[in-house]
């Protein structure tokens, strides 16, 4: 059973699955799919080619799937894809992709607090937290389990690694490595995110290896190339250190230090 308020506008062609609740004055466009258990509170607008997964809660005055703000965008049939079990709070804006990636994508279990902006072609993993007024510019990639403090803008094409935590009112213009704490304008590294790693169930051995890797990368004065070679040699069997090394090697914007 679908629960749709009498004042909501659902255009012909929209696919609304059982268990969806759509509140007062919502607008759902003709190319939208909303899967079971998702709740749209009041005044939510969902347009464009948009798919919203199961059991999401979308609060008042959220806008999803509208045309992006890229001046090169000419109305291409790009998409917005949202997974399951996300909480999207008041006044969040999530724009559709461009012909670069063809989609903006959000994973599962994320908390996106009020007034966050998710621009075109952004990719967000799972179980991330975005505090109020975070701004993700176009093409930003946020790996799973990251936490971004409030009022933080992130430059286009920047990547944020898993299990990292960025302090509030920071400004991010380079990639932020996984597993670290970072803060400042512009952002600098403040150490390993040890409390966060413990809360996520990392073992003492895993944390110890990441501490050693952090020291080799950022505290011993080595050239980055030499530090990476040392990590590959000494931690070849450690999946977390391998992810860290691969992250740095794949960086296009350079890494924050």
Curated annotation (Swiss-Prot):
Q: Which Pfam families match?
A: Acetyltransf_11, Hexapep
Role summary: Involved in the biosynthesis of lipid A, a phosphorylated glycolipid that anchors the lipopolysaccharide to the outer membrane of the cell.
Q: Does the keyword Lipid biosynthesis apply?
A: yes
Q: What catalytic activity is recorded? A: a (3R)-hydroxyacyl-[ACP] + UDP-N-acetyl-alpha-D-glucosamine = a UDP-3-O-[(3R)-3-hydroxyacyl]-N-acetyl-alpha-D-glucosamine + holo-[ACP]
Q: What is its main location?
A: cytoplasm
Query: How is this protein organized at the quaternary level?
Result: Homotrimer.
Task: Look up the coiled coil feature and give its residue ranges.
Answer: none
What is this protein's name?
A: Acyl-[acyl-carrier-protein]--UDP-N-acetylglucosamine O-acyltransferase
Biological process per Gene Ontology, one example term: lipid A biosynthetic process
Species of the source = Fusobacterium nucleatum subsp. nucleatum (strain ATCC 25586 / DSM 15643 / BCRC 10681 / CIP 101130 / JCM 8532 / KCTC 2640 / LMG 13131 / VPI 4355)
Q: Where in the cell is it found?
A: Cytoplasm
Q: Which family does it belong to?
A: Belongs to the transferase hexapeptide repeat family. LpxA subfamily.
Q: Which GO terms describe its cellular component?
A: cytoplasm; membrane
Listed EC numbers: 2.3.1.129
- At the top of the EC hierarchy, this enzyme's class is transferase
List the pathway annotation.
Glycolipid biosynthesis; lipid IV(A) biosynthesis; lipid IV(A) from (3R)-3-hydroxytetradecanoyl-[acyl-carrier-protein] and UDP-N-acetyl-alpha-D-glucosamine: step 1/6
Q: Which Gene Ontology molecular function entries are recorded, alphabetically?
A: acyl-[acyl-carrier-protein]-UDP-N-acetylglucosamine O-acyltransferase activity
The gene designation is lpxA
């Amino acid at each position: 059973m679908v629960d749709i308020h009498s004042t909501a506008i659902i255009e012909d062609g929209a696919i609304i699955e059982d268990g969806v609740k759509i509140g007062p004055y919502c607008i759902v466009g003709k190319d939208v799919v909303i899967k079971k258990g998702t709740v749209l509170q009041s005044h939510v607008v969902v347009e464009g080619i948009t798919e919203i997964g199961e059991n999401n809660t979308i609060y008042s005055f959220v806008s999803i799937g509208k045309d992006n703000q890229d001046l090169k965008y000419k109305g291409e049939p790009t998409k917005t894809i949202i997974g399951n079990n996300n909480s999207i709070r008041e006044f969040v804006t999530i724009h559709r992709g461009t012909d670069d990636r063809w989609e903006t994508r959000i994973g599962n279990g994320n908390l996106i607090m009020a007034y966050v902006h998710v621009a075109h072609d952004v990719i967000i993993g799972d179980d991330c937290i975005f505090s109020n007024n975070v701004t993700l510019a176009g093409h930003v990639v946020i790996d799973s389990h990251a936490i971004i403090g409030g009022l933080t803008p992130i430059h286009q094409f920047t990547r944020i690694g898993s299990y990292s935590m960025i302090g509030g009112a920071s400004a991010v213009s380079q990639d932020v490595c996984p597993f670290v704490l970072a803060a400042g304008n512009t952002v600098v590294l403040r150490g390993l995110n040890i409390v966060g790693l413990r809360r996520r169930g990392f073992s003492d051995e895993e944390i110890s290896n990441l501490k050693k890797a952090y020291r080799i990368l950022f505290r011993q004065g080595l050239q980055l190339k030499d530090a990476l070679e040392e990590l590959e040699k000494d931690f070849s069997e450690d999946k977390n250190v391998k992810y860290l090394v691969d992250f740095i090697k794949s960086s296009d914007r350079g890494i924050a230090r």
